[in-house]
Each structure stands twice: as structure tokens, then as C-alpha cells.
């Protein structure tokens, strides 16, 4: 029996491999964006694709995000599967008109006759000390746009598996890539890289009985660290990685709440108007009789991303998460 080596790989490498394998398997897959070809992308996630598949299939575009996504709409209507890279999270805002008015609506507009298999890759979140427009958490905008799937991996295996699923989907997918996890490493089997749960399914990363931390993307490692630290206080925390914000896995989340009776939602986006409000509402509506305390949120503050020297104070950290868990215990005890 042959043993397949499991070796450390970064999330960036897994994403590159996902696009390479998709392009090799399907000639209709085209990668496009600013500097994705010759440079290989700002984060080098498309490195080598232009050399391997040619500039016709890995194409450098002008610095015009609305034009990039508008071209992708035409390509998808023609029968291609464009994979669009928006260089940074806030750079995607000029393309909102295309995304909201056309990408998200085309299947409904044509009564299902014309799907748009577009994957929009967006590096997002903080953690790299980026200046204005280079760090943002914009997932709530996409969640509020019917017709879009919104996916964000937090592990190397999910980076590969979810991106392959997104590219193969006939629905448009906003694929949010946590910038600060690009260089995170994990053991990964390159010969069985698609062995992950499908889009729309959450995963319990750590089991527990005291409370549930509901999170996704860049906040998963922080929640795992907080769960380990909580053991010293006698708290046994469960951690649920959503992986997909749309579709949302109510079943897995509510099953966790039934076990723990308490929940904290953790994300980098703002508290007011952020994803945590929707998640807390869904938990309350579906699991109310299992809750022993109100659902709490630990989020970025309601301000634009601060300058690099203040960023660590803005992002949810272990101390803020443990404070929320302590409040849950106090609320439950009356």
C-alpha cells in the first residue's frame, strides 16, 4: 500500500494549486485581474499560472475593477468560468454596480436560464498593517446581496477545497481570502486535496460544553487560542467555523448551541451592521429555548480600519473573547 506524504503547505500555495488544477481540468476556466499574470498577484497567489497556461487564460487587466467584473459577466454569459481577483478588499468597491446589478441578478433575471459561474476572489481583513483601502472587512455587504454565495476559508485544506467548489459552481461566489492567513501553514495531503465539507456546511473545529464560539476566516485561529486559554478558567469552549456565510449552516450551529446553551460570535467586521447581528438573530430565532444567556458579539470597533500601529487593538483578541465568555457565565447565573 502506497503512503501519501502529508507535508506543510501555506494557504497561498493551496489556493494557487486549486486554480492550477481547475484550469488543467477545464479549459473554460480563466483567471483575470490586476497583476495576476506576469507578477503572479500582489500576494503571489497566481504565481506561475500565466507561464503554464498562457496569458490568454491568466490575464493582466487595467486598474479598473468595474471593467474587470463587467468583462467577467460577458465571459460567463459566453460560456466561460472567469476567476476574478480584486487586488485588495476595498478595491472591490468600484465594481459593486456590476456585482449587485448584474452578477447577483442574472440567474433570476433570466428565470434560471443563464447562470453566471463567476468566482470573485477578494483578499480581506486585517493583520498585515495595511494602509487605508488595503485592510477592510466587507463581508456584510455581500451577505446582504441576494444571489451571491459568500465563502471564506480558514484552513489550508479548505482554501483548496472550497475554491475548487466555487470555481465549479454555476452560482456566482464571492471568495474571501483572509490576508493574514495566506502564509499560515498546515499539514495538507496534495493527493487528496478535495476531501472537505461542501460550501454551505460549517465545521466544529473544537468540541466543548461551556459555550460556543461561532466564527469564520481570520478569526478562527484567535478563537482556537482563546478556547485553549479558557481551560485555565475551567471553561470548555466549542468552536464552530462557518466557512460559508451564504449559504448559512443553521443545522450545525444550532446543534452546537443545544450542547452548550451559550454563544459568542467573533469576527473582524464591525459590530453594528456586521455579520454577527444576523448570526445572533438566526441563533435566537431557531435555538431560543436552548439558550441560557443572550448571544454576544466580539467584533471590530465601529470605525474604519485604524492605522497599522493601532490595528492590533481593533481586531478581536483572546482577552476580549474571554471577557465575553465570562459575561456569558455571569448572565447564565443570573
What are these regions (language model features)?
Residues 1-176, 181, 313, 330, ...:
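Thiamine diphosphate
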Amino acid at each position: 500500500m502506497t503512503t501519501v506524504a502529508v507535508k506543510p503547505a501555506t494557504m497561498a500555495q493551496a489556493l494557487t494549486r486549486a486554480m492550477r488544477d481547475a484550469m488543467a481540468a477545464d479549459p473554460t476556466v480563466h483567471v483575470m485581474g490586476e497583476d495576476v499574470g506576469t507578477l503572479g498577484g500582489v500576494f503571489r497567489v497566481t504565481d506561475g499560472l500565466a507561464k503554464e497556461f498562457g496569458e490568454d487564460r491568466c490575464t493582466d487587466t487595467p486598474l479598473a475593477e468595474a471593467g474587470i467584473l463587467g468583462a467577467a459577466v460577458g465571459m460567463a454569459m459566453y460560456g466561460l468560468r472567469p476567476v476574478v481577483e480584486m487586488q485588495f478588499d476595498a478595491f472591490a468597491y468600484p465594481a459593486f454596480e456590476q456585482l449587485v446589478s448584474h452578477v447577483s441578478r442574472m440567474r433570476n433575471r433570466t428565470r434560471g436560464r443563464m447562470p453566471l459561474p463567476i468566482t470573485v476572489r477578494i483578499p480581506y481583513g486585517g493583520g498585515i498593517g495595511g494602509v487605508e483601502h488595503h485592510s477592510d472587512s466587507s463581508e456584510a455587504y455581500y451577505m446582504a446581496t441576494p444571489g451571491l454565495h459568500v465563502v471564506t476559508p480558514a484552513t489550508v485544506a479548505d482554501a483548496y477545497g472550497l475554491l475548487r467548489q466555487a470555481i465549479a459552481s454555476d452560482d456566482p461566489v464571492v471568495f474571501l481570502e483572509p490576508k493574514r492567513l495566506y502564509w499560515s501553514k498546515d499539514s495538507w495531503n496534495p493527493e487528496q486535496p478535495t476531501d472537505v465539507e461542501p460550501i454551505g456546511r460549517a465545521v466544529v473545529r473544537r468540541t466543548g460544553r461551556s459555550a460556543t464560539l461561532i466564527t469564520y476566516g481570520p478569526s478562527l485561529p484567535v478563537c482556537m487560542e482563546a478556547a485553549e486559554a479558557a481551560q485555565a478558567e475551567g471553561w470548555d469552549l466549542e468552536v464552530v467555523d462557518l466557512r460559508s456565510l451564504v449559504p448559512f449552516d443553521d443545522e450545525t450551529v444550532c446543534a452546537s448551541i443545544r450542547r452548550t446553551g451559550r454563544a459568542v460570535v467573533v469576527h473582524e467586521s464591525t459590530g453594528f451592521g456586521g455579520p454577527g447581528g444576523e448570526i445572533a438573530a438566526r441563533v435566537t430565532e431557531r435555538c431560543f429555548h436552548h439558550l441560557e444567556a443572550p448571544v454576544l458579539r466580539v467584533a471590530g470597533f465601529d470605525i474604519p480600519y485604524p492605522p497599522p500601529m493601532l490595528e492590533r487593538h481593533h481586531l478581536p483578541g483572546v482577552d476580549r473573547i474571554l471577557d465575553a465568555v465570562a459575561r456569558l457565565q455571569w448572565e447564565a447565573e443570573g
